[in-house]
Every structure is written in structure tokens, then in C-alpha cells.
Amino acid sequence: MDVNPTLLFLKVPAQNAISTTFPYTGDPPYSHGTGTGYTMDTVNRTHQYSERGRWTKNTETGAPQLNPIDGPLPEDNEPSGYAQTDCVLEAMAFLEESHPGIFENSCIETMEVVQQTRVDKLTQGRQTYDWTLNRNQPAATALANTIEVFRSNGLIANESGRLIDFLKDVMESMDRDEVEVTTHFQRKRRVRDNVTKKMVTQRTIGKKKHKLDKRSYLIRALTLNTMTKDAERGKLKRRAIATPGMQIRGFVYFVETLARSICEKLEQSGLPVGGNEKKAKLANVVRKMMTNSQDTEISFTITGDNTKWNENQNPRMFLAMITYITKNQPEWFRNILSIAPIMFSNKMARLGKGYMFESKSMKLRTQIPAEMLANIDLKYFNDSTKKKIEKIRPLLIDGTASLSPGMMMGMFNMLSTVLGVSILNLGQKRYTKTTYWWDGLQSSDDFALIVNAPNYAGIQAGVDRFYRTCKLLGINMSKKKSYINRTGTFEFTSFFYRYGFVANFSMELPSFGVSGVNESADMSIGVTVIKNNMINNDLGPATAQMALQLFIKDYRYTYRCHRGDTQIQTRRSFEIKKLWDQTRSKAGLLVSDGGPNLYNIRNLHIPEVCLKWELMDEDYQGRLCNPLNPFVSHKEIESVNNAVIMPAHGPAKNMEYDAVATTHSWVPKRNRSILNTSQRGVLEDEQMYQRCCNLFEKFFPSSSYRRPVGISSMVEAMVSRARIDARIDFESGRIKKEEFAEIMKICSTIEDLRRQK
């Protein structure tokens, strides 16, 4: 029988059906090929929005730069980046007036952070532009390479381990006339294999040093590498995102720390909180506006959308904001915070890999690297690409494009939120000095605006004034994409509000299912996702029970671990049946060993091993959780592990799940093909770090491991720890006098070696 899908909605209130309209089932779209075209679009668009600004040339790099600040007053409807400095400063002053001491206190908090942050903060984050190799690397490797190059160039402030000292090196490196870097390269030769007598390509890895002059070094230090944003749902076109190098990252981190501290104190800010906390914050603002509007006023809410938020923001404005926020603070603090926006005013966008060409006969493919775009004959390109290249050419230097205006995606989320909130703050009656007033919510580029007034004309006037105020600060509310409703129905950061928040369950759909970490983690993550959705997203008991059954089924098919008494034949079924037959208490077998599922919606919080422990045969317990069993992974099992799950929008979320170390928590081995590439040096570095860290963890088991607060190296910390432990063990009689003496001797030897180095 066919079911008419509209029948499903007859009894459902419209607002609860919202989640069915979201494009969140199935795989998200990924990008293929290079991001060069998208990056050129971004650069060209950004310049177009600021085109009536003033052109200048960077004296160090020769890059042409466009400065739209205090440019012509913006025109209606056209997105533009002509922010007015005095307006921004005034908005900041009013924000401070409504929140006395907010900037002062945030500065004090940030100063503490600045003095305590260690340089390993920069190892967080995934791909980072590595300026030494001129391509992307994992953050930890990029940082290590940077420090290695700094030290070989005599920049050693970073040895203290504090981030602020590393940044001193960055500052000094920019004054150097030349910087020497080591690059990895590959040599290929054809040789005859002795055994098979066939010709094979042999690859060897070489390292060579070369010098960058001041101009080349500055260009690299100011470069943001670009990539295509993957897995973006609900969009037809892809777009470019940026990843900055290590020189910029530390400075950005401190600016964002300050801005985060301010956002935490602002009731209109949707950052840095998330989830239920964010919903509570939003509900408060709505409640405030509704209670005040019950009798005499009407209240409307705009679900707002801004046109090209990043491309119209300007680092120079951020500099003005920081200058204001840090007034009366020590000089060193003001300087360190102003460097990030200054670097962003001089940034260069790397155009990525370039273009791929295929000949009509399909026999030949060739890549045109971005460096060649400046002077290649344009007859090979189609019209739209031709236009892009012509437009970007005056801005090109060494395959990077000068991009002074605009802020690439996701760099200053917190600080731009402060800017947005400062406009919402101006909606108080004491500032509007008329009958309408407004308030709202801001989270990076997303906003919701609530306007109250005695009549419709007042609402219109309020919205117009808000729109024009935004224009003066370089924010462009899109009249086409924003829509207005009676207060009580709006959407903000994909939360739908209808007299309270409606669970938008479709957004959680991608995180259901088997994650693919390993059998142990997947079981734990799967049930935790269901549990969390029962708590947060209106997942009802019947649906949750069904989700659980589907998950178990999915899990069994993924790991081919159907019940021991099933008829389904898989590669594992022979072994699993054997285990099933020789097990007395079959209920004690884990699902991944062909056991039955004992989960129901009441016990989702208990790890499966704990749930079944009492039911297990003794010898099964011994095999499953025996630390001497070579298959039990004890690499880094904490009682709580973190899984990265991908919700439908926003960044990947960290989700905690309980981890019990068993034979099922294996860690897969690295693919060997990397060993033959130029990445090999990187891999060797990584293994060296791994060994050092493992050694360090032996000295500081996790129970006693506190972040070292003093400024000492890992070696010093380990030596002093060894001495303390040896003394305790000697005095309690656990080790003999000779052993104690030997340990002390080794410690002294290590210290001598360090001094000689």
C-alpha cells in the first residue's frame, strides 16, 4: 500500500515538521580539484565591495593594498566595506557605558592568560599553512618546523616554552634581512631491480637549505593558504576557507581570548556558549522583549542574514576596536594585541594548486600552478575564468594575491561578534531617544533582531535605523534574505524558536550510526548519541528504542558480528559460533563477539563491558580485559575518551564517551605508503615527538600529571622527577643503595650533556 507522505503531517504542528525540510540525510557534498577559482572569487569580491577606497603600496613587499575605511558613505542595498572609524569607536564607548568595567576586566583576565599560555597551544587545530615548506601540514608539525628554523637562525626566546616568547621571535624574524630555511625534496631515479630484473623508480629524500630575503620571508609570514570548504550542505556553490601560518596564529589566539572574555559578559552574544546554555540565553532576551511589549507595544523579530560578513569586515576596524578596548592598559599588552589586525591588513592569499588542463584528445593532462597565472596567455581559459584572472592580476606576487580588506572565514569570530553586539546595544531607549527600541542576539555573522514599537510605522523606523547603523560599521544586513515575523517565531544559528525552542532533530541525523573508530568506541559512541538526543533533542522513548535497535543492527553488519545462533554467514561467523558454543553464560558475550544486546533506553549510560561483567564467564573476562593480553590496547585509555562527531552544521563537536580498555579497543596501524614520499621526514619527526611524549608520560603518570607551570624543559622536569622518585624509593627501602647511586649518576650525566650542547 502506498502512503501519501502528507498524511504524516496532519497531526503534527507545522513548527515540528521544520526538520524534514533540512538537507541533512545522506552524504554531504565534497569538493574536488583545486580551490584556486573559489579563492580568486573571494579576493575579487572583497575588492569589489571596497572598490571606492584608497590604493596604497606596502613598502616592504610591494603589494598593492586597498583601504576602504572612512571611505564614501555606503549606498542603500549594495554590500560595502566602508566602515567609519568614529562610528565604531562610539559604538564601543556606548557598549562600555552600558556594561561598566567590561573592557577593563576582560583585559586583566586576558593579561593573565597571555603570561601563562604555553606555545603548545598552537599545536591544536588541524591543517596549518607551513611557511617553511610552503604547503599545509598538521599544526604540530608546522609549529615544530617553525621553531626549528627560528633556532637555526639564532632566534631562541621560544626556548622558554611560553607563547609570548615565541611571538617575540616572530616579531624579530620580521626584522631580519634574510632567513634560512630547510626544505625537503624528492629525487627520482630509474634503477633495475636485482631480483625481478624490471626497471623501478627509486625515490630518495633530500634536505636542502636556502635563504629567503626579507621580502620573500614577509610574504610567507603574511600568507593564508586557502582550501575549499568541504561537506557544506544546502549550497550549490563551494567556497574557500583560509588557514593561516604559525606567525599569525599566536597573535590571533590572544585577540580572540580577549574577545571571548568580553562575549562571555554580554547577554546578546551567542558565543562562546553552545547547546542548551545558548538556548537559555536566547530565551531570556526574547522573554525580556515580550514582557515589555504586552500591553502598549507590538514586537517583531527579524531572522537576520548578512551579506558576505567576512568580506566586508576590515582588519583596520578591528585594530581601532582593540585600541579602544585596551586603552589605559600597559604598552606591551596593547602592542601584542594590535599585531594580529596589522598582519591581517597586510595579508596575502595563496591561490592554492592552480588549474588542471586536459587536452581534447584526453591523452594529456597538465597543471598550471598558481605562480604562472600572472603571465600565462589567457586564450586557454573559458570566459568566466579569464575575467577572474584579469581582475586579480594586478594583485599577484609570487602566486599569492594581496588581500588587505576583508577577513577570511572564521578568523575573528569572537571579535566580530563584539562588533555586532555593540549595534544591538544601541537599541536601548536611552540611545534611540524615540518610541521604538531593539535588542537581539549575535553569533559571529548570524543575528536575530527584536524590535518593539507602539505601531507598525515605529517598527519600520526601528528596522531602518538598525540597518543604517550596521552600514556605518561595515555590516550589511541583506534585505532579500532577512525576514520579519511577530516575535515568538524566528530562527537563529539553526535553532528554531516558536514560543520556545523546537527540537531540530534532522541536524543530529548525521551523527547516528557507526563511527568507525573501533568496536569498543563505536558501541559507546552510538549509545551515547542516542542518550544525548533523549536529553537535548526531544527524542522520545519509542523512537529512541527504535534508534537503538537500528544502531545495533547497523553495528552488527559493520563488524560482521551477528549473534552466535544466527543463520547469517559472514567471514567471522565461524569463529563467533565456536565462541558461542563454548561459552556457558552467553548473555555475557559482548555484541562484537556475537553476544545478545542488553541495552535498552534505561541503561544507555553504562559501558557495555560493565553492563555484562557479572554475566561473563571467568576465562572470557580474563581474555577480554587482561593487561598482559597483547591485543588489549592500553595506549592512552582514559576513563573518558573524546569522539569527534559531525553535526549537520557548525564545526565538528567533541563528544565524551566512556571508554573501557578491552581487546576491542584496537588502534589501526599507519598506512605504509607514506614512507616512500617526501612526507617521510615529517613522519620521522612525528615519531620522535611520540617517543619523547611517551617517555615524558612514563615519568609523569596521568594521575600525577599537572601541566608544568614553571619554565623548565621536558628534560629538566624528567631529571628532577627521577631524583625525587629515586629518593622516596630509596628511603622506603624499595631500591638498594647501589641502584640509588646509579640513578643519581645518570641524572648528573644527562645534565652535563645538556650543558655541553
Curated annotation (Swiss-Prot):
Organism the protein comes from: Influenza A virus (strain A/USA:Texas/UR06-0195/2007 H1N1)
A GO BP entry: DNA-templated transcription
Post-translational modifications reported in the UniProt record: Phosphorylated by host PRKCA.
Subcellular compartments: Host nucleus; Host cytoplasm
This protein's name: RNA-directed RNA polymerase catalytic subunit
Domain RdRp catalytic, residue spans: 286-483
Lineage: superkingdom: Viruses
Function description: RNA-dependent RNA polymerase which is responsible for replication and transcription of virus RNA segments. The transcription of viral mRNAs occurs by a unique mechanism called cap-snatching. 5' methylated caps of cellular mRNAs are cleaved after 10-13 nucleotides by PA. In turn, these short capped RNAs are used as primers by PB1 for transcription of viral mRNAs. During virus replication, PB1 initiates RNA synthesis and copy vRNA into complementary RNA (cRNA) which in turn serves as a template for the production of more vRNAs.
Top-rank EC class of the record's enzyme: transferase
Gene Ontology molecular function terms on file: nucleotide binding; RNA binding; RNA-directed RNA polymerase activity
Protein family membership: Belongs to the influenza viruses polymerase PB1 family.
Assembly and oligomerization: Influenza RNA polymerase is composed of three subunits: PB1, PB2 and PA. Interacts (via N-terminus) with PA (via C-terminus). Interacts (via C-terminus) with PB2 (via N-terminus); this interaction is essential for transcription initiation. Interacts (via C-terminus) with human PKP2 (via N-terminus); the interaction competitively inhibits the interaction between the RNA polymerase subunits PB1 and PB2.
Region (Disordered): 50-82
InterPro entries (alphabetical): RNA-dir_pol_NSvirus (IPR007099), RNA_pol_PB1_influenza (IPR001407)
Stretch list, region Promoter-binding site: 249-256
GO CC annotations, alphabetized: host cell cytoplasm; host cell nucleus
Enzyme Commission number(s) from the entry: 2.7.7.48
Motif (Nuclear localization signal): 187-195, 203-216
Catalysis performed (reactions): RNA(n) + a ribonucleoside 5'-triphosphate = RNA(n+1) + diphosphate
Gene name in the database record: PB1
